[in-house]
Amino acid sequence: MIKGISFQNSVAHEKTDVFRDKVQYNAFIKNELAYARNVPADVNGDAKAGRIRAINSVIEKYKPLENIETAVLIDIMISFRNIEAFKEMLDFIKQMPRYVFETVMVQEQYAFVLNRNGGKAKPTDEVMINEAEAVLRKLETEGKASSETYGIWGRIYKDKFDRAYKSGNTGEAKGQLKKALKYYEKGFEFDPRDAYPGVNYVTCLELLGERQKALRLLPAVEYAVKAKMNRKAPDYWDYATLLELAVIENRFAEAEEFLNEAKPLAIESWMFDTTKGNLNLIMNFRNERNEDIDPIKELILSLG
């Protein structure tokens, strides 16, 4: 619930995806923000800067923020996330009126963007990352946690795992991976319809070599993905998730089919990079266990 905006029976991870379809609010501003998110790239191929300026123009036009309806404020926040303007997203959330800032949805997105900015900082901003975890812990303590809360919490530790793994600190990496698994498990148990913590839970089990447990869980996650695809038009991440699950189960012919379905739905090249990163992890960990990695290598090459 966000000040009169209800997501009854919705999967928590889908709140930001379905928000614009489910919530009635100022149609003119809604269209202005839709245009802002899709401003064409400039002559140098840079679309992001122009889109940020366009969103900021909408904010300037209707501020102060206290006079803007709650749903529009949420759309602005999601718009910054949609275009990956994470610094601007964080700055905007901090300016939100208190009654909006303290809602569960905004607090979850606040934790998400704190972790994203903290992890991308050079050097890593541990203070920001710790604040992200504190936000999620407060939601849990207050009984407001959702599968999305735990999914974001798992992502904090998965990012810590990635940093430790890339720096060659395998001991720390394994410890962080186990913590990520714990929160992804909590998220999927909280709501088995939410495939996001589910697929990450399965992937963590795969990386830790707990294959049998991963295979027992996998059909439930696959069902959750397909159920989501029946609720709304499939997107890139739906097929990418099915691809990853098929790889874990060694169904490589199906994995290739899912890849072919996913490719036309990728609206940004970084989407392929995310999938390649996940597949590379599975491949590297299997290689360390002396397992066959050739089929995974072929899929990675197909991603370009």
Tell where the protein language model's regions lie, with residue ranges.
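Cross-kingdom TIR/SEFIR domain
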Residues: 1-14
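Amphipathic alpha-helical repeat scaffolds of TPR domains
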Residues: 21-57, 64-81, 99-121, 143-166, ...
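Helix-turn-helix repeat elements of alpha-solenoid scaffolds
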Residues: 39-57, 78-93, 115-135, 170-182, ...
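Conserved structural position within tetratricopeptide repeats
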Residues: 64, 97-98, 137-141, 182, ...
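Alpha-helical linker/edge segments of TPR/alpha-solenoid repeat scaffolds
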Residues: 117-124, 160-167, 206-218, 248-252, ...
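Acidic, serine/threonine/proline-rich low-complexity intrinsically disordered regions
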Residues: 166-173, 255
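TPR/TPR-like (Sel1-like) alpha-helical repeat modules
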Residues: 181, 188, 193-195, 202-206, ...
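Long, ordered, amphipathic alpha-helical scaffolds
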Residues: 228-304
